[in-house]
């Protein structure tokens, strides 16, 4: 009897425990289902949120997080040729009243530079302060450099001209961190920046290459202050001279900058790459702008051998169905650069990008347009040298009209281009393919 009672109790206990286990299991399953539903709902909400954020807004947010200001209320004029750039610049120099600041990779010792320095001499005689800064390596690397005798003559004109980072022994110490920017500021009111230095070939082209295509822009408004700060910081670095004063930043407290009545206000971010201050910024912004694209990316760059981060971004954009169009030149001023560029472009073509081979001269423009909503124009080449080593500056312009103007130019330049196809690549000689492959191995230092 005792055994029977114990067995019954054990059975009842086991039954109760099983009931408890079943209840716990049910609760656990319910908890899992609830958690899964919450995660799914959150993911759907995130997807909806991400989809609702436009590419331009996303890039603005990214820039702000990186400490780069989005500056509203500017006016931008694109200058699509050397003729237009120098005509516009020279006209403004004639109107200068207080100071003229120039920062270039090089001033080529030719006729357009002579005209520029003669004009600057006239302004210096009127009491306008002229400061000019150029890169020592940029000067040395062009075939018509400014020599000591030329610099002596320029200084005698009343122009304060300075060479950035002179090439002294051991020269290897001066190979990297060059000043590749192109900036002019007049009276703190107007600035120019983009891809053009000072040389005749921006107007006349070069033998064996043909027309030299490039892109520059004129900016009026509060964004000029950012370019002024970049110049004065570099001037201090090169000379030790500290320049301060409110008259160098006339737009700082002017939130109601008066635009031309026919112009719409434009928001601009001045992205400055300085080797120590912001070494990763330019490649991060380029990559993010590519990743945020919703529909289309149009890109022109003369030495197209991007760093890994930018290449990965382009591949991801292609893989998610973004229309990626890249324009590269069949001719170049630097040796085997086209071969390296062709090698990279072919890899992206196989991935799904459209690659246009520009035949009508050399397209030295450094521009990118995204979704017809925003664009960038500047000095930055999409190669390791610009993205990893040199001083560079780009303006990211958040305006559909300016972006549309560049896209229209891109569309027209397709007429002077060939589309890279598998058939075209098959016809390319094995030697040229090998040179491209080998040159690509050197891209970390190109």
Regions picked out by a protein language model, each given a short descriptive name:
Residues 1-46:
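Bacterial Sec-dependent N-terminal signal peptides
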Residues 38-446:
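Charged, low-complexity intrinsically disordered terminal segments
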């Amino acid at each position: 009897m005792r055994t029977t009672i114990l067995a019954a109790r054990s059975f009842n206990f086991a039954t109760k425990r099983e009931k408890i286990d079943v209840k716990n299991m049910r609760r656990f399953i319910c908890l899992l289902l609830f958690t899964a539903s919450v995660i799914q709902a959150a993911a759907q909400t995130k997807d909806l949120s991400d989809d609702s954020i436009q590419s331009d807004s996303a890039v603005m947010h990214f820039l702000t997080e990186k400490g780069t200001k989005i500056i509203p209320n500017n006016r931008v004029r694109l200058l699509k040729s050397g003729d237009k750039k120098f005509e516009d610049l020279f006209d403004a120099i004639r109107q200068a009243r207080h100071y003229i600041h120039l920062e270039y990779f090089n001033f080529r010792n030719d006729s357009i530079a002579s005209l520029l320095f003669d004009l600057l001499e006239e302004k210096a005689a009127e009491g306008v302060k002229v400061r000019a800064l150029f890169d020592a390596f940029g000067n040395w690397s062009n075939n018509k450099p400014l020599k000591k005798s030329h610099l002596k003559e320029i200084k005698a004109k009343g122009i304060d001209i300075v060479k950035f980072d002179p090439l002294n022994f051991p020269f290897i110490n001066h190979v990297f961190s060059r000043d590749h920017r192109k900036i002019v500021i007049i009276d703190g009111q107007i600035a120019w920046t983009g891809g053009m230095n000072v040389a005749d070939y921006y107007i006349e082209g070069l033998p064996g290459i043909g027309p030299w295509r490039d892109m520059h822009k004129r900016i009026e408004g509060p964004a000029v202050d950012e370019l002024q700060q970049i110049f004065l910081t570099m001037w201090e670095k090169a000379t030790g001279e500290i320049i301060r004063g409110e008259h160098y930043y006339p737009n700082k407290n002017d939130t109601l900058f008066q635009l031309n009545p026919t112009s719409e206000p434009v928001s601009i971010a001045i992205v400055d790459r300085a080797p120590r201050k912001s070494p990763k910024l330019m490649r991060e912004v380029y990559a993010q702008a590519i990743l945020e694209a919703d529909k289309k990316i149009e890109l022109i760059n003369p030495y197209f051998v991007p760093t890994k981060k930018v290449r990965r971004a382009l591949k991801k954009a292609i893989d998610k169905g973004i229309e990626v169009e890249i324009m590269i030149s069949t001719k170049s001023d630097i040796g085997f650069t086209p071969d390296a560029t062709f090698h990279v472009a072919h890899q992206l073509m196989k991935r799904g990008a459209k690659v246009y081979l520009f035949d009508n001269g050399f397209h030295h423009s450094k521009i990118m347009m995204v979704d017809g909503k925003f664009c960038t124009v500047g000095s930055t080449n999409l190669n390791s040298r610009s993205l990893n080593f040199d001083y560079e500056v780009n303006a990211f312009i958040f305006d559909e009209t300016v972006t549309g103007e560049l896209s229209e130019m891109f569309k027209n330049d397709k007429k002077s281009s060939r589309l890279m196809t598998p058939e075209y690549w098959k016809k390319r000689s094995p030697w040229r393919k090998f040179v491209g492959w080998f040159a690509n191995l050197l891209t970390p230092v190109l």
